[in-house]
Amino acid sequence: MMKSSVKEILESLRLLDSSERSSSLPSPSTFRAPMPLIRQSLPAKFRNAISLESKTIEKEDKDWSTEQITQSAEKEKTGNEVVKISTAQMSRAKNSHDPEWINSAEYFVREKLCVWCRVAANGQWHLGKIHSTSSSDDVCVMLSANDDVRTMEEIFPANPEILEGVEDLTQLSYLNEPSLLYNLRVRYSQDLIYSKAGPVLIAVNPFKNVQIYGEEFLSAYQKNALDAPHVYAVADAAYDDMMREEKNQSIIISGESGAGKTETAKYAMQYLEALGGGSFGVENEILKTNCILEAFGNAKTSRNDNSSRFGKLMEIHFSAKGKICGAKLETFSLDQSRVAQLCNGERCYHIFYQLCAGASPILKERLKIKAASEYNYLNQSNCLTIDRTDDAQKFHKLMEAFNIVQIPQEYQERTFALLAAVLWLGNVSFEVIDNENHVEVVADEAVTNVAMLMGCNSKKLMVVLSTCKLQAGRDCIAKRLTLRQATDMRDSLAKIIYASLFNWLVEQINISLEVGNSRTGRSISILDIYGFESFKDNSFEQFCINYANERLQQHFNRHLFKLEQEEYEGDGIDWTKVEFIDNQECLNLIEKKPIGLVSLLNEESNFPKATDTTFANKLKQHLNANSCFKGERGRGFRIKHYAGEVLYNTNGFLEKNRDPLHVDLIQLLSLCKCQLLNLFSTKMHHDFLKPATFSDSMNQSVIAKFKGQLFKLMNKLEDTTPHFIRCIKPNSNQLPGLYEENHVLQQLRCCGVLEIVRISRSGYPTRLTHQELAVRYGCLLLDTRISQDPLSTSKAILKQCNLPPEMYQVGYTKIYLRTGVISVLEERKKYVLRGILGLQKQFRGYQTREYFHNMRNAAVILQSYIRGENARRNYIVVGESAIVSTAITKELDAAIHLQYMVRKWLARKLLNSTQQKNKPRNEKKKTRRKSTKRVSEDKELLSEQFEVQPCVLADLQSRVLKVEAAIMQKEDENTALQEELQRFEERWLENETRMKSMEDTWQKHMSSMQMSLAAACKVLAPDKTASHGTDSEDTMSFGTPTKELKGSLSDVNNLSTEFDQRSVIIHEDPKSLVEVKSDSISNRKQHAEELRRLKSRFEKWKKDYKTRLRETKARVRLNGDEGRHRNWWCKKSY
């Protein structure tokens, strides 16, 4: 394989002496954690608590991030020390006279500290104290008041009490198996089922309900109010990484059967649903799919009451805003054999028991459903119920889930019908008919019900189950089956129907959860696959399950051990390799070509005469050289898996791997009336015709399909960032509160928890390329003139943050950071970005204000221009209208002036006539006035001659005041009279309106009367044949009314004319009074007197006018009535 030029350059650089290295590349960090003091027993957490006060005093003089990094550095330093201790303990087996451990033992004796020692009687670890030591490697340990002598290899140091029940196992001062077991046991006893082992979450199944879930905890973890280990925290970390890095994430849940993987997966989905719930509305559907998949894919086994008999990968997609927009479900290798064969104490799939217990009476009657004990497929294991499980209630929840996932009611009933058909197939029996053990189907209730539920002919069904067709040239021969063959044919039909139904349900779920156009490339995949299994009798199904777990363990090792350590070594940083248990040898045993177990199984399955015994012999012949394989007598063989050694029996391996698909069964399904069965048959027929070559036929084997699915799954997981959850089963009896140390220890060893903690405490979980670090945290640099070289920029960033050198290492291509450093950098970045945002906010505010002021000033100027233009236009319009109005005003003024002159002339004329009449009286008044004038002149002379007395002056002043008051009163009266005049004008307008309406009415009456008169004239025209006397009479009788009518009309016209003239006079007279402006008291009195005269004249005319109007109305009405009577008489006489 050719190496790239970059790799060659890096390899050559590694070989160069440190003095010859390029200055542009960093030298590997020389930092190594110092060896711990032998007497050191307290953890970093405890030391930090002691020095808290001093740190608080010094905090003002330190950078805040430096303090956090220093505390993290102390923790990491302790971690590295513990690694050295553990390494020393591992080496003591080779050199039992290690002086360091002897000194440590003396320290433990002197301080009376505890150690762990395994008791041979029960194999349990117990706490004891070292009582004494010898010159050899033997120590005396006191256990429960009994002394026991042990070698140095048999004891391990115990952690102080302050570290009991720590959340993260990396916080333990002494890292060994008994310390891990004890810490998990303490937490398990307190219902703290979650613990951390570096990046891995350890979940111990409590086998009971614990109060650490629900809305309160969901909200707390969303708000980062809690940081305790929890499945919610893992899901939250996956979500944050997806949104921040825009990379797909995966949550891989593993563990043995019964460890709680399915429940853990459901809680992870629940948190993601709460975190990413949105307007798309699919989050509830995603949760409800668990109910459907558990019912159809889970069953009770001897080790787990709710064991998943299939693997599933739920890929949840998110929008750019982090909201769930859809999901996709993938399933792997459903255990079909469980439909027909069960071990004692186990159950078939949950759905069958739920259907029998929870179906409504109407549904049971329609589908012929009986109790579960009536079906052979269910009662063969003598286990029909599960403790603390209500199958009827589960069935009702299943119905709700069907509705939420939008499976139509019609298809729900068809699904239940096929389930009932599978149950009744188990009750189909056969009868032997000859000595060759050939059989035929017994025509009983079971056959009838199966044919009815499938929608096929019962006779056709019986033929298919008891015979098989063989092609002999062009002829097709029907061959009878033996009892074993017929039973297998029946069971094959049941398994085909159930497996096809399961796959169809998965397709319907995917249709309901389809992402569509909302796909953004951001997803979180949750893997829940069957756990490691080892029973008394292990067959093909257990081999497939354990093979899948081996592949998952390799993925786990690859990401947590191999890739990380290879990256450390390849990038040139200082690193001490951590050993771990690698299962690659076991995978080679299974997968290696051409002599791997899978290849040999496929090869043997293609030989028609091959048997399970020949297959077992071939395995022993080719695989004995592998350390993970061990042949047994007969058909048995052993494989040393990562989780333990398992004994397999090859009985049924070949037949189950071939999984022959009978053409007769496909044809039977295609003839059924059930639409689902027709759909299943079409797909199976397509798959049956698909293989065209030998290699294709090999790929059709069950193990080949399973291997292909497994590799596809691994490739998908490799493209994601993994988050691991290891589920631990505390006891094999599934009892709450029971903690079996040996059972837990075996699982911890299989998971490599000890090695995970070691590598987590001494490793660098966060790594970024120089370019990524420079781009992401370049904003932390205050000096913008720094070199643009990413390496130099990265170093400057780390120096700017005052990070201790032991908290990071600089590699050839990446920067490696210890735990906690990235959070400090993120906090510093947030702090700087908040300042930048504040500055941007202020600047944008200034820009906005300036823009607003400019816009306001421009608007004011524009408004002024517009108002000026409008004013000019209005001035032109007003000027033109003023010219017109001035001409009209002049004409009106001339008319008013003319009227004024006429009224003035009339008033003078009236005055002259009045003066002529009153001339004698006036002369007398003149004489009296002259005498009065002489008297007044005499008084004036007297007043001039005599001084006015004060009392007289006061009297005169009071009189003046009275006169002024009288003038004011007269002015008020004048105002009142003007108001009254205005009211009279209003009344006049009303009267005028009424008169007009009355005039119209009378005009109409007159028109109708004239028409009647004209008609009467036409009717009463002079008849020359009539007598002269009659004509004379008629003429006189008609003539009089006509004259009267003409008289009435003339009266009406006179009244109308008089009314018009009078209205003009009444309207003009007050105006003339108003127009004459005079402030003298005499003129005011004259105006008031003139107004009273106008008022009295108007009242008098109004009264006379009303009288004449009534008389005229009476005459007109009388003439109208006579005309009607005359008209009637004329018509009658005519």
UniProtKB/Swiss-Prot annotation:
Q: Where is the IQ domain?
A: 832-861, 855-884, 891-920
Compositionally biased residues, Basic residues: 918-933
Q: How does it assemble?
A: Homodimer.
UniProt-annotated binding residues for ATP: 255-262, 304-312
Which PROSITE patterns does the record associate with it?
Answer: IQ, MYOSIN_MOTOR, SH3_LIKE
GO-annotated molecular function: actin binding; ATP binding; calmodulin binding; cytoskeletal motor activity
What functional role does this protein have? Myosin heavy chain that is required for the cell cycle-regulated transport of various organelles and proteins for their segregation. Functions by binding with its tail domain to receptor proteins on organelles and exerting force with its N-terminal motor domain against actin filaments, thereby transporting its cargo along polarized actin cables.
Let me see what the UniProt entry remarks about domains.
IQ domain mediates interaction with calmodulin.
The residue ranges of the Myosin motor domain are: 164-830
Any GO BP: actin filament-based movement
PANTHER family (alphabetical): MYOSIN, MYOSIN-4
What are the Myosin N-terminal SH3-like domain coordinates in residue numbering?
A: 110-160
Cite the SMART domains for this sequence.
IQ (SM00015), MYSc (SM00242)
Q: Which family does it belong to?
A: Belongs to the TRAFAC class myosin-kinesin ATPase superfamily. Myosin family. Plant myosin class VIII subfamily.
Name of this protein: Myosin-4
Keywords (alphabetical) are: Actin-binding, ATP-binding, Calmodulin-binding, Coiled coil, Motor protein, Myosin, Nucleotide-binding, Repeat
Coiled coil (UniProt feature): 953-999
Task: Fetch the InterPro entries from UniProt.
Answer: IQ_motif_EF-hand-BS (IPR000048), Kinesin_motor_dom_sf (IPR036961), Myosin_head_motor_dom-like (IPR001609), Myosin_N (IPR004009), MYSc_Myo8 (IPR036022), P-loop_NTPase (IPR027417)
- Can you tell which superkingdom this protein's organism belongs to? Eukaryota
Q: Where is this region: Actin-binding?
A: 589-623, 710-732
Q: Which gene encodes it?
A: VIII-B
Provide the species name. Arabidopsis thaliana (Mouse-ear cress)
Its cellular-component GO annotations read: myosin complex
Q: Where is this region: Disordered?
A: 913-939
